[in-house]
């Protein structure tokens, strides 16, 4: 009933009493039961018990009665947190992560915890323990990851998701499933209460039906004191840079969908120009694995220590269920594959990259970068780490997402494939700190393209 209704409109109807919070909750629970095969939730017990009810204490809140679910590496008080790995079974969060606390204070209700790739170490959301997250827009195709469970639920009853993103874990699933995925400027929202991969790169994000909904949520979560320039003083349409390195090696379907979107933007007055980003691209490629793989082995145990779960550290590493994740982690535990000198060099270089990216925006007088979110379409056989055109599937997918993560840029993916086709995401990035400008401009582009409704006819 509420699948196509903008979030702001639905919130208004809840406040006016046109729609009841109980009705939304019941519809969401009904949809979860009907679509259990998509493995979107990690449940320890009854869904009815874990799906909160709207509290009268927050009835005046802007999101009162709106269900929000969280990736299962995000702490929600009194709910289990597994990070998708069996070794964390029995861990119950004693407090809320920052993003959870903020959404609860606005009146949102917790719908549960979403399935994910084990320990966030992958982009397919194949999970040996809790099942592979399904793709509601393209049944049988990969949902992406590591936050795949957050997108594997069709957008019924106003249900929204908050995942985390290290190198693309929000934006990859959004692109593969035909919805909007937003990663804020690194550090804009605190990552406290999130089981980490890398403190340098991790950020909480949003998965929403549309970019317009993401912009609405961003404004509520961040408030008015963001220090960002007013969007009203920025000229639209703006100048958009197309980084040449991120437009190469595309599948025909991806290339066609993304260039069609760019041409429509140009017809609407956007000045889209190709950029020579070769030096930046080469620098970024040296950073993809070094920092997260080095930081994980201190950040993850330290997080468990801070949560009082230090006794679980050995159990987690000993009981990793996914053979590919286990191989990676055990190889790094057995031997120092990344030296301290290499890690220090990578931190220095990530600082250089961030300076160079923001200088690029200024030098080229561009407001946004635009590029395909992924170079390949979602595979119909969901591989843990299979090979595509001679490169690992992981490397092929993450190559266009990791730049924004390393450069600390706000980034959003919006769907651009025609109805009935496999989903394709077009990515937009803005300079550091210009999150609201990014979201409002991308929402304007979304309206121009008319691609704001995910194609999930199979389930409705």
UniProtKB/Swiss-Prot annotation:
Residue runs in coiled coils: none
A Pfam family it matches: Amidase
Annotated keywords: Auxin biosynthesis, Hydrolase
Xref: InterPro entries: Amidase (IPR000120), Amidase_dom (IPR023631), AS_sf (IPR036928)
Gene3D superfamilies in UniProt: Amidase signature (AS) domain
Gene Ontology molecular function, alphabetical: hydrolase activity
Active-site residues annotated for this sequence: 71 (charge relay system), 146 (charge relay system), 169 (acyl-ester intermediate)
Function of the molecule: Hydrolyzes indole-3-acetamide (IAM) into indole-3-acetic acid (IAA).
Top-level EC class as recorded in UniProt: hydrolase
Listed GO biological process terms: auxin biosynthetic process
Organism: Pantoea agglomerans pv. gypsophilae
Catalytic activity, EC: 3.5.1.-
Name under which the protein is recorded: Indoleacetamide hydrolase
Known pathway: Plant hormone metabolism; auxin biosynthesis
Family classification: Belongs to the amidase family.
UniProt keyword Hydrolase, yes or no: yes
Protein's UniProt keywords contain Hydrolase: yes
């Amino acid at each position: 009933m509420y699948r196509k209704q903008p979030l702001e409109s639905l919130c208004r109807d809840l406040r006016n009493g046109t729609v009841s919070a109980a009705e939304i909750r019941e519809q969401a629970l009904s949809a979860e039961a009907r679509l259990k095969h998509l493995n979107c939730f990690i449940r320890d017990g009854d869904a009815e018990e874990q799906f909160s009810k709207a509290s009268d204490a927050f009835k005046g809140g802007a999101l009162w009665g709106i269900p929000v679910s969280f990736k299962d590496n995000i702490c929600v008080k009194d709910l289990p947190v597994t990070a998708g790995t069996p070794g964390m079974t029995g861990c119950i969060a004693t407090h809320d992560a920052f993003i959870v606390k903020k959404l609860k204070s606005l009146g949102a209700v917790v719908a549960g915890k979403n399935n994910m790739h084990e320990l966030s170490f992958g982009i397919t959301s194949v999970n040996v323990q809790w099942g592979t997250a399904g793709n509601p827009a393209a049944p049988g195709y990969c949902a992406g990851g590591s936050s795949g469970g957050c997108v594997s639920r069709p957008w019924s009853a106003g249900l929204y998701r908050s995942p985390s993103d290290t190198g693309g874990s929000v934006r990859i699933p959004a692109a593969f499933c035909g919805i909007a995925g937003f990663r804020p400027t690194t550090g804009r929202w605190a990552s406290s209460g999130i089981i980490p991969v890398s403190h340098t790169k991790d950020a909480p994000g949003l998965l929403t039906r549309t970019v317009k909904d993401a912009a609405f949520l961003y404004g509520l979560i961040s408030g008015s004191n963001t220090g960002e320039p007013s969007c009203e003083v920025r000229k639209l349409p703006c100048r958009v840079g197309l980084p040449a390195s991120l437009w190469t090696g595309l599948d025909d379907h991806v290339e066609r969908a993304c260039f069609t979107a760019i041409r429509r933007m140009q017809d609407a007055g956007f000045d889209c120009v190709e950029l020579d980003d070769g030096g930046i691209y080469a620098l970024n490629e040296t950073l993809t694995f070094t920092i997260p793989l080095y930081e994980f082995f201190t950040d993850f145990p330290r997080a468990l220590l801070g949560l009082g779960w230090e006794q679980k550290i050995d159990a987690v590493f000993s009981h990793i269920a996914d053979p590919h994740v286990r191989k990676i982690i055990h190889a790094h535990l057995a031997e120092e594959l990344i030296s301290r000198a290499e890690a220090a060099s990578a931190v220095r270089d990530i600082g250089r990259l961030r300076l160079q990216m923001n200088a690029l925006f200024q030098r080229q007088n561009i407001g946004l970068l635009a590029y395909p979110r992924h170079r390949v379409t979602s595979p119909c056989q969901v591989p843990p780490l299979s090979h595509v055109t001679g490169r690992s599937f992981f490397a092929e997918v993450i190559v266009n997402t990791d730049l924004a993560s390393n450069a600390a840029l706000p980034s959003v993916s919006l769907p651009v494939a025609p109805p009935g086709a496999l989903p394709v995401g077009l990515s937009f990035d803005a300079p550091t700190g210009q999150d609201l400008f990014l979201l409002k401009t991308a929402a304007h582009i979304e309206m121009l393209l008319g691609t704001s409704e995910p194609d999930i006819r199979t389930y409705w």
